[in-house]
Swiss-Prot record:
SMART domains: MoCF_biosynth (SM00852). This is Putative competence-damage inducible protein. Belongs to the CinA family. SUPFAM superfamilies: CinA-like, Molybdenum cofactor biosynthesis proteins. PANTHER family: NICOTINAMIDE-NUCLEOTIDE AMIDOHYDROLASE PNCC (PTHR13939), NMN AMIDOHYDROLASE-LIKE PROTEIN YFAY (PTHR13939:SF0). NCBIfam families: cinA_nterm, molyb_syn, PncC_domain, PRK00549.1. It comes from the Bacteria.
Length: 412
């Protein structure tokens, strides 16, 4: 079965609010085997909503509406659908009583327009609104399923979980959808695709969907099966094939992120970290401290933006700054080693480079050096050649720091 989500509300078209309902519903529907092929947004206009209904009926088995169930004149979803289906609107007694009780409790007048919220399509299954007034409803007619839900996410989401999903399962084959996200760093989307292109071209079940985002690449593997164990086997087989080719760039699954993975390894190995940041200006340290309980492994950092701080606090030799420059392999090495010693940590990591938009020390924007000093091991400096805006270069530099830290920790 395939569905179309139709969000109703002029405020969505004006960009005043984001359509988070569609994202939530798409994910939930996919998990029970209902394919969402279209998202539509239409304003509070009867004629245009009717046109959207007619288009959706021509290409979807299920039409899911969010918004337009309120008490005002521009809340016209129910009325338009009732007219389209030649159905009457009738009062749902439970909803009417619930709304009436609310107004009594709050000492407000229960006006006629508020009674409108208790109107439902005749013959529809009614979904109680435990967090608001207007109920939702579901109607199966003319070979189509119509679902009407309130617009506010705080009302729609719990209604979906408690009442709508159990109702929708009556229309599914029992075949569920299971997904796993593989996360990669240090390889571009096009490079990764080339290495697994034959797997993408031959995909059936599971499917493979690549996505690039802020210097990372993810592959979403999605399998359909009635049995979760069989779906896991399908996904695992394809994952194994992928990691045989690009496993060196793989670092985690689903909602795992680089900084969390690196800190997890620091805790596991009982090592402490310090950082010296020039071009990143504290971005790396900020991300470290986003993780709970990080005080056990993070000693602190030095923002050494000016050369005076590099020289007098972190003891980068004046000769290095004069000859090689602040943006250099040698400077990154001294920063990493000396911040480690200064803060008495097991590991020192450093960032120096040109964020742009202008060149510096005759070096182009995106020229970056990340230094990594771990205990008594030889210090390693990773040269980077990044592209993007000033902010993107800074953020990607910090990510590369976490990536190289994570990979190095895996080795020791």
């Amino acid at each position: 079965m395939n569905a179309e989500i139709i969000a109703v509300g002029t405020e969505l078209l004006l960009g005043q609010i984001a359509n988070t309902n569609a994202q939530f519903l798409s994910e939930k529907l996919a998990s029970i085997g209902i394919n969402v092929y279209y998202h539509t947004v239409v304003g509070d206009n009867n004629k245009r909503l009717q046109q959207a209904i007619e288009v959706a009926e021509g290409r979807a088995d299920m039409l899911i509406f969010t918004g337009g169930l309120g008490p005002t004149k521009d809340d016209l979803t129910k009325e338009t659908i009732a007219s389209s289906l030649a159905e009457e609107l009738v009062y749902d007694e439970k909803a009417l009583a619930s709304i009436s009780d609310y107004f009594k409790r709050t000492g407000r007048e229960f006006t006629e327009n508020n009674k409108k919220q208790a109107l439902v399509l005749d013959g529809a299954t009614v979904f109680a609104n435990d967090h608001g007034m207007a109920p939702g409803m579901g109607l199966n007619k003319n070979g189509k399923v119509y679902i009407l839900l309130p617009g506010p996410p705080k009302e729609m989401k719990p209604m979906y979980v408690s009442y709508v999903e159990p109702f929708l399962r009556n229309f599914t084959t029992g075949e569920n959808i299971y997904s796993r996200v593989l996360r990669f760093f240090g390889i571009g989307e096009s490079q990764l695709e080339v290495k697994v292109q034959d797997l993408i071209d031959g995909q059936t079940n599971p499917t493979i969907a690549p996505l690039a985002n802020d210097g990372e690449v993810t592959l979403r593997l999605t399998a359909k099966h009635q049995n979760v164990d069989e779906a896991e086997k399908l996904i695992q087989h394809v994952e194994d094939l992928i990691l045989e080719r690009v496993g060196e760039f793989f670092y985690g699954y689903d909602q795992e992120f680089l900084h969390d993975k690196a800190i997890e390894l620091l805790k596991k190995k009982g090592l402490t970290l310090s950082c010296a940041e020039s071009l990143t200006g504290g971005l790396f340290g900020n991300q470290v401290t986003e993780s709970a309980g990080v005080s056990s492994v993070f000693k602190g950092g030095v923002i050494c933006y000016h050369n005076d701080v590099k020289q007098h606090v972190l003891h980068v030799p004046e000769e290095v700054l004069f000859t090689d420059g602040a943006v250099s392999k040698e400077c990154a090495r001294y920063l990493a080693e000396n911040v480690k010693e200064l803060l008495e940590a097991d590991i020192g990591i450093s960032f120096t480079g040109v964020a742009g938009p202008d060149a510096s020390e005759h070096k182009e924007p995106g020229t970056v050096f990340v230094g990594l000093a771990i205990k008594d091991e030889p210090t390693v400096v990773f040269p980077l050649n990044l592209s993007g805006s000033r902010q993107q270069i800074r953020e990607r530099s910090a990510k590369y720091g976490f990536y190289h830290l994570y990979k190095k920790l895996e080795e020791i």
